[in-house]
Each structure stands twice: as structure tokens, then as C-alpha cells.
Amino acid sequence: MFHNLNEYITAEHALMYLSKADSIPHRTEGEAALLEFIPKDAKRILDLGTGDGRLLALVKIERQDAEGIALDFSPTMIKAAGERFSKDPKVQVIDHNLNDPLPNLGQFDVVVSSFAIHHCSDERKRQLYSEIFSVLSPGGVFCNLEHVASPTDELHSRFLRSLGLSEGEEDPSNNLLDVETQLRWLRDLGFRHVDCYWKWLELALIGGSKSK
């Protein structure tokens, strides 16, 4: 069931997430897998739900000259990302809620997201994927490191235990969806080379590219 709620608008919830982000099991493995799919010559990069800018900063390590656009709607996250990129004139942090249509920002060689899109309703997820396809340049790449639904309740409980959480401690703004449905959507929208490139329990890297 979709909870029409996103706790990250509150500073308390956003700060709690940031304090725990580095301890998410296997997160760095997923990020490393994502980086392998990002072209070294990418010129424009869009980061959806940037949080404190961690993923975009990783992408830019080997792409210093790339222009980065980072979207988020949490004042706490926007402030953190702004501070992270304060000395990088090629990065712009924009206040934007992913529940709303993407703003007109031009075309991008790469669109990335990390643990953000799963907060949207399923209908909005699919619509957002369509918008992502539209803003990708020919040959562009989309990579989404995401929190996805487990295929069974037992596996979901195992994932929660790995985080040291009980079912009552789950993020009420989560709206998890299985990998297979999202991959099907991407294929239907016209993405090529669609796959789940990496996965550990409920953490998955999904994506594809646009024809040249």
C-alpha cells in the first residue's frame, strides 16, 4: 500500500537517514557496480533525489569536468548537498519533489538515482521512468540504485534483521516494488540493455540505456 507521505521533508528524519547511510550493508558494492556503467566521457549528469550528494560526488570523481544537476526536496538534504558541492561551480542543487514532473533542464548523458524513487507511488515511478527516458540524450544511461520489494515475507524479514530493524521500525514513506515489474516498464518505455546489474536482498541496481 502506498503511504502518501514522505518523512524526509522533516529535518529529524533526514538527519537520521544521513547518520545511518554509511552503515547500510553492501551499499558501497552497489555504488561500485553503478559507477562501472557510467561513461567516463559523460558531460551532463542528473541525480534524482540526491540526498547529501554522495552518489553524484562519486560519479564526478573521474568526471571532474561534467556538469551535475542534483534534485531533492528536503531542506536538510539540499543544505547538505549544497555544502558538499560549494566549491564545484559545475554542480547545481535544485529544490524539486520527484512526485512532480521533472523540470525542463535539457538533455543528459547520464541519469542516476540512489534510494529515492521507491518513495513514489507505483504510478509515479512509471511516469518518472518515462520522463527519464525523454531527458536522456541518444546513447544516454540510466542507473537506479534502489530499495526494492522482496519476493517473500521471509526475505523481507531477513533484510530488516540485517539492518537491525523490526517491522514496526520501517520507513513509513517506503513504497517498495519488485525488480521484475520495474525492468518490464523500462523495456516497454524503450530502454535497451535493461537488467538488474547488481542485487543484495532488497538493494538492487536496475537500469538501461537509450539507443544512439
Q: Where are the language model's segments positioned?
A:
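Conserved class I S-adenosyl-L-methionine
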Residues: M1-P39, R54
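Nucleotide donor/acceptor-binding cores
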Residues: A42-K43
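Class I SAM-dependent methyltransferase SAM/SAH-binding core
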Residues: L46, D52-D100
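A short acidic, Gly/Pro-enriched loop at the edge of an enzyme's catalytic core
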Residues: P103-V111
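Residues lining the SAM
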Residues: S113-I117, L145
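A short glycine-rich, Lys/Arg-flanked "PGG" loop and its adjoining helix->strand segment in the class I
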Residues: R126-P138
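C-terminal alpha-helical "lid/dimerization" subdomain adjacent to the S-adenosyl-L-methionine
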Residues: L145-L189, V194-C196
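Core SAM-dependent methyltransferase catalytic element
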Residues: L189-K212
